Design a protein with these regions (language model features):
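Patatin-like phospholipase
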Residues: 1-49, 57-360
Length: 360
């Protein structure tokens, strides 16, 4: 099947922090290596959420997954020279506001105790301190400046409407409580760097990002991995990359036997992943039934793969392990004639290169 005759293939890359982006790069690099007529930078539409938004922009801007893979493996490569300080920068404005509000709440507490020592509404006073918490601990300002420099140096379009192939980045309007598609009207002229950080602004950790007078927070998988956006752009097939899934552990697990032994954050992470994965799978199933003309192909880590789970989403130092693990597992899947991923991609007109052989 020649390239012009191939069905339109869209890509939806979901978030998952730095480690999630590394997983997605590893998967896409393996697809480029193993498949005929597949280059991740030449697909028909790109949808990105969270750190997936950064990857979507890079691919749509002409960077191949193989190039990104090599660059991220090599710390000396200057393609995407991200450092910790680009992300780990305190949101001083919010912290100053929180400090002032905490002082005010403390004064009101002591005032209430002095005036009515026996009638103090403790929970009401505690609420004042909750209201004093910052909207986010870190700022995306440094990351935005870094992304803007990368976009400029690599010749990537500076606004979302300037791409040759459609790019849609997902965020949530904080005050409206709704999903927003950056790249569609009235946000088609949005700065690429600003749109990326709006999609990446994970609540609590990062302060909301202001865009056109509105506050935005990062998007996650949503109810259906945002495949509806790719379908509206005319894609007959949509690849969905979801790096974050619940882990399955037990006595035979090499790193973890019981999650409760690893503490509160591990338990919370597993709980969040269970809920998110359930919503995603149910949403994809509903969409598939309502739109049988659109074929959906979900790519995720194996449930027993502890590589993605045991590293913090912000752990840039784990990039080599995650990149190579995702690349290796995807390659093995594609070399297996019985694997559903291979069958799905062949249905989309992308054949495994014969020279790569089979692992059947």
């Amino acid at each position: 099947m020649s390239a012009p005759d191939l069905p339109k293939l869209g890509l939806s890359i979901l978030g998952g922090g730095v480690t999630g982006a590394m997983y997605s790069v590893g998967v896409l690099a393996a697809l480029e290596e193993q498949l005929e007529d597949f280059r991740a930078s030449e697909l028909d539409a790109y949808v990105g959420a969270g750190t997936g938004a950064v990857l979507a922009v890079g691919l749509a801007g002409g960077l191949t997954a193989q190039r990104l893979y090599r660059a991220l493996l090599n710390p000396a490569d200057d393609l995407f020279p991200m450092k910790r300080h680009h992300l780990l920068r305190l949101e001083r404005r919010e912290l100053r506001r929180a400090f002032g509000a905490t002082v005010a709440a403390t004064k009101k507490l002591f005032g209430s105790v002095r005036k009515h020592p026996l009638d103090v509404d403790l929970w009401h006073e505690v609420d004042r301190f909750f209201d004093a918490l910052p909207a986010g601990v870190l700022t995306m300002d440094g990351f935005e400046q870094f992304l803007a420099s990368v976009v400029d140096r690599r010749g990537i379009p500076a606004t979302l409407d300037a791409f040759e192939r459609p790019v849609r980045l997902m965020a949530n309007d904080l005050d409206a409580g709704t999903r927003v598609v950056l790249g569609e009207a009235p946000h088609e002229h949005t700065s690429v760097a600003r749109a990326m950080v709006a999609s990446c602004a994970a609540p609590v950790l990062f302060a909301p990002v202001e865009l056109d007078g509105r506050d935005y927070i990062g998007s996650n998988a949503g109810e259906m991995g945002h495949v509806d956006v790719a379908a509206q752009l005319g894609c007959a097939h949509v690849l969905v990359l979801n790096p974050q899934v619940p882990i399955r552990v037990g006595p035979d697990s090499s790193r973890v036997q019981r999650l409760r032994q690893r503490g509160l954050l591990w338990v919370y992470s597993q709980s969040w992943r269970i809920v998110t994965e359930s919503r995603l799978l149910q949403g994809l199933e509903r969409f598939a039934k309502a739109h049988p003309e659109v074929a959906l192909h979900l790519i995720e880590p194996e449930r027993d793969d502890t590589t993605m789970f045991t590293h913090s989403p912000m752990n840039f130092a784990a990039r080599r392990e995650i990149l190579e693990d995702a690349y290796r597992r995807t390659t093995l899947a594609l070399r297996n004639p019985q694997h559903p991923l291979r069958a799905a991609l062949e249905a989309a007109g992308r054949q495994v290169r014969e020279s790569q052989g089979d692992a059947g």
